[in-house]
Amino acid sequence: MNLHEYQAKQLFARYGLPAPVGYACTTPREAEEAASKIGAGPWVVKCQVHAGGRGKAGGVKVVNSKEDIRAFAENWLGKRLVTYQTDANGQPVNQILVEAATDIAKELYLGAVVDRSSRRVVFMASTEGGVEIEKVAEETPHLIHKVALDPLTGPMPYQGRELAFKLGLEGKLVQQFTKIFMGLATIFLERDLALIEINPLVITKQGDLICLDGKLGADGNALFRQPDLREMRDQSQEDPREAQAAQWELNYVALDGNIGCMVNGAGLAMGTMDIVKLHGGEPANFLDVGGGATKERVTEAFKIILSDDKVKAVLVNIFGGIVRCDLIADGIIGAVAEVGVNVPVVVRLEGNNAELGAKKLADSGLNIIAAKGLTDAAQQVVAAVEGK
């Protein structure tokens, strides 16, 4: 679950990290009033969406008058911002962040993620702030400096100083950087985050560090113990199908293809998408119904898949280990009957009660294509989309 920039900066403030004074506004009038609260300009106005690349898309602007603030707010509030990180429809702009402009001398980068290979929280810092860190990693990886947090000791001040020295910081900037490093690490661990990023972390012309931007991603599996973060969730920034799936504890990610996939198990789901592409198809989604699939959840999964107008066929690939294939069959039959499916449905069942599940599908009288294996299933669903 991602947070908006203004929400990230609210958290920064709670932990004593320096950030520009700013206010999130939902109307042009509020935006003008925010400028008055901040004081004399110039100001920076920013569209609040869950996507990077806002500046290049016109969603960030330095303004010198309240009239310009009103014009910016009137232009963007209620509209959709399209960036390189969004789809063609973009993300809705419901808030504008108005904050004091900062005199920038140098831009840095500081962020942290959970590194799966080392099984540690890893901090990354770079002198190349203000650009996508992925681009820096690809083109100039030697400019990214890393430290891993020991899960027993947690963050240590010497690690912050080590990064500061590698960035070429001196004097009071080393102390300020170390404080920010320790604060970010504390936020990351206490708030069950998956990602935290300040890009850019700037050195002002007055010689101080300030968090000019903020990006936070919370671990969705830990939200049950982070009620205040859960309340910050902005579902308008999410695919409505993904939000609906989350309510049923389904793992759903929308993609750009036309073959809907319903699978139990994340690994099998990825393998299913791979074999569909291998045979010339394009998956419309990733959907994992999980090991505890019920008839109701399978029915809901079917509804979510078919709510995508791009879907021209559905592939159901179930391995019955924990889940029983006959229950999955009941869910498929119920969903097809309830929703009124008008696209081909290819089903591959293996494992626990697979034969009983296949018999139920055959006896249902519905237009469901039974596959004899995974390769056969992929070939049949691709052929169905192509009208063969």
Swiss-Prot record:
It catalyses: succinate + ATP + CoA = succinyl-CoA + ADP + phosphate; GTP + succinate + CoA = succinyl-CoA + GDP + phosphate. The keyword Cell wall biogenesis/degradation does not apply. It is an enzyme of class 6 (ligase). Keywords: ATP-binding, Ligase, Magnesium, Metal-binding, Nucleotide-binding, Tricarboxylic acid cycle. Binds 1 Mg(2+) ion per subunit. The keyword ATP-binding applies. Substrate binds at residues 264, 321-323. ATP binds at residues 46, 53-55, 99, 102, 107. Exhibits two interesting properties: 'substrate synergism', in which the enzyme is most active for the catalysis of its partial reactions only when all the substrate-binding sites are occupied, and 'catalytic cooperativity' between alternating active sites in the tetramer, whereby the interaction of substrates (particularly ATP) at one site is needed to promote catalysis at the other. InterPro entries: ATP-grasp, ATP-grasp_succ-CoA_synth-type, ATP_grasp_subdomain_1, Succ-CoA_synthase_bsu_CS, SUCC_ACL_C, Succ_CoA_ligase-like_bsu, Succinyl-CoA_synth-like. Mg(2+) binds at residues 199, 213. Optimum pH is 7.4. Its cofactor is Mg(2+). One of its GO terms (molecular function) is succinate-CoA ligase (ADP-forming) activity. One of its GO terms (cellular component) is cytosol. Pathway: Carbohydrate metabolism; tricarboxylic acid cycle; succinate from succinyl-CoA (ligase route): step 1/1. Belongs to the succinate/malate CoA ligase beta subunit family. Succinyl-CoA synthetase functions in the citric acid cycle (TCA), coupling the hydrolysis of succinyl-CoA to the synthesis of either ATP or GTP and thus represents the only step of substrate-level phosphorylation in the TCA. The beta subunit provides nucleotide specificity of the enzyme and binds the substrate succinate, while the binding sites for coenzyme A and phosphate are found in the alpha subunit. Can use either ATP or GTP, but prefers ATP. Succinyl-CoA synthetase (SCS) of E.coli catalyzes its reaction via three steps that involve phosphoryl enzyme and enzyme-bound succinyl phosphate as intermediates. This is Succinate--CoA ligase [ADP-forming] subunit beta. It comes from Escherichia coli (strain K12). The lineage of its organism: Bacteria, Pseudomonadati, Pseudomonadota, Gammaproteobacteria, Enterobacterales.
